[in-house]
Every structure is written in structure tokens, then in C-alpha cells.
Amino acid sequence: MNRLFLVLIFLYKKLLSPFLPPSCRFTPSCSEYAKQAFETYPWYKAFVLSVVRISKCHPYHEGGHDPLPKSYNKS
């Protein structure tokens, strides 16, 4: 399942992202964060981390450096 999400992220980064203005307020970018999450954690944990990160991407959040957590133990 992780491989499917990684392919979707790859396609987004190669086919869609180049046509969108740069707007990510975080480092690493949300797509890179999601890629790292799916390379590190089981798909269900990576999915939750990615959704939470993307939900913070709005004008009222300051953004900045927000790396992937080293461990994720949410039950």
C-alpha cells in the first residue's frame, strides 16, 4: 500500500506540481513530508501524518521547519 501512495506522490510532483505556484509554507514541502512518511511508517500512520500536515497548510499557520517525527506512537 505504501508503494501506491509513493507512486501517487511521485506523479503529483512530476505532473501537477510544476504547473502550480510555489505556495508551501513548510520545509520540507508537504509532498516531500508525505513521501518521507510513506517511506518510514506503515501506510495508515503515514496517511494520518500527511493529512495532519496538509491540514496545517493555511494562511493562519506560521509554517516553518516541520520535519517528520523520529517516532510516531499514536494508538
From Swiss-Prot:
Family, as annotated: Belongs to the UPF0161 family.
Protein name (record): Putative membrane protein insertion efficiency factor
Keyword Hydrolase: no
Cell inner membrane keyword on record: yes
Keyword vocabulary terms for this entry: Cell inner membrane, Cell membrane, Membrane
Native source organism of the sequence: Leptospira biflexa serovar Patoc (strain Patoc 1 / ATCC 23582 / Paris)
Main location: membrane
GO CC annotations, alphabetized: plasma membrane
Topology in the lipid bilayer: Peripheral membrane protein
Cell location: Cell inner membrane
Function: Could be involved in insertion of integral membrane proteins into the membrane.
InterPro entries assigned: Membr_insert_effic_factor_YidD
